[in-house]
Amino acid sequence: MTSLGARPRLTERALPEGAPLLALGVGLALALSAGLAVGLGADGPPLGVSLAGGVGALTVLALALARYDLAVALGFLVLGIVRIEPAPVDGVFAIVMAVALVTGRFDLRSAPLWASVLVGLFLALNLLACMEAVDPSRAASFLSITAYLSLLGLWTSGYVRTHRRARMVLKLWIGTAALTAAASTLALYVDFPGSIELHERYVDRAQGLFNDPNVYGPFLVPAAILVLHELLEPRLLRGGRLLKLLALTVLVLGVTTSYSRAAWLNLGVAVLVMLAVLPLRRGGVRRASALLLTLVACFAAAGVAVVATGSSKFLEERANVQSYDTQRFGAQRGGVELAEEHPLGVGPGQFELLEPISAHSTFVRALAEEGVVGLAVLVALLLATLGVAVRNVMLGRSTAGLSSTALLAAWCGLLANSFFVDTLHWRHLWILAGLIWAGSMLPPGGMSQASSSTGVRSPT
């Protein structure tokens, strides 16, 4: 991948001179720890959990210092386990980022300057809104997660610079999502040890190791889009067409059995974007036709599975308007009213304390909790990322071999999802943003090594 600017290249084991980065790394770790402690409250977790967490943190720290990429791989392996906040993935990536700061691997210049500025401004507005918080402890905990996830996006932009790392991320993301989808779908119809944990909240809806099917379903979509593009045009995952097709089918079935209308919208928008973009390139009509045939086969397989398990009636019910939709829209109206009463916002994480149910919209939450200015900054960040994703496609840029077309499609799906579900604390949203930012740092007209070596023409 093309190097950034003319600055000296840091080797993976290079250590910075002096103490500033060490202090910054320690400060990050302490800030995240403080947010976790405040969020857990005065009682804290049981002693056994605390000891296990401490041992786990020390193990991850040792791993990150000795085998940095292996620690990152561990983070992606547990990306699909988010029952509480902070989640296991947060502990792993927080330690990885702290080590990256100390060892000079975390370079903010690897992300666009505008992204860093908008992230910093949004966090500052979150901090300002804390003055209005009715529960300062929850505000501190919620803000610490937002800050960590913002940094995760910026770190991702600098990490995925090589094809080896991009391939590792792609394999782990697709593999983790596919295994989660397979186990969660099977758990709906077959009892096995731990199966109840995979659909604990709703008997008829798969939720994986998330708290809500509306988070689990959308988690599978980017992986499905990435493997779909690899199936049509192999770049990082050579061979194994049948395995890719199986993974795609399992992921589509997983999205279906989440019975999340937002997840269905997410996948539908992403697929439509791919269908719109693929014909713009040479040979794109043929690939778009192959895409349609592949999707027909996958959805047909998912439909057969739904009918065979006797779930077709439930699928039809879920596709209709639900009785609780009125409550959700009422809560969103309440969010607008909160913004009118509190111009600076009511503070991070306060929406559920002031309204009967969650915001069910990233934008309504931002409006209520950070005010009009906070919403404007967040929208600017999301739309600028969308603009960069479109530009990456038109200029033929990819992120170390990761298709800019697939990244654009997945991002559009997430944006559509964000109107109906609060996505601010979704780990894969910020990772996806980081991957798009990384691609934008290529020079105009530049193409990744993977694209040029395989004869790929823009847009990618």
Segments and roles (model prediction):
Residues T2-V26, L30, L395-A400, A433-T460:
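A juxtamembrane structural motif centered on a specific transmembrane helix
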Residues P16-G18, A182, L186-D191, T257, ...:
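A membrane-periplasm/extracellular boundary helix in multi-pass inner-membrane enzymes
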Residues A29-S33, G56-L61, M97, G120-L128, ...:
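Alpha-helical transmembrane segments of multi-pass inner-membrane proteins
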Residues A31-S33, I95-A100, G268-L272, L408-L415, ...:
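Transmembrane alpha-helices of multi-pass inner-membrane enzymes
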Residues L47-A57, E85-R105, L143-L152, Y216-A224, ...:
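Membrane-embedded alpha-helical segments of multi-pass membrane proteins
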Residues A62-S150, L402, L414-L415:
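N-terminal hydrophobic segments of proteins, predominantly signal-anchor/transmembrane helices
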Residues G194, G310-V372, R391-G396:
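Long extracytoplasmic/lumenal interhelical loops at the membrane interface
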Residues A247-T249, V390-F420, I436, S440:
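Loop-to-helix entry and N-terminal half of a specific, functionally important transmembrane alpha helix
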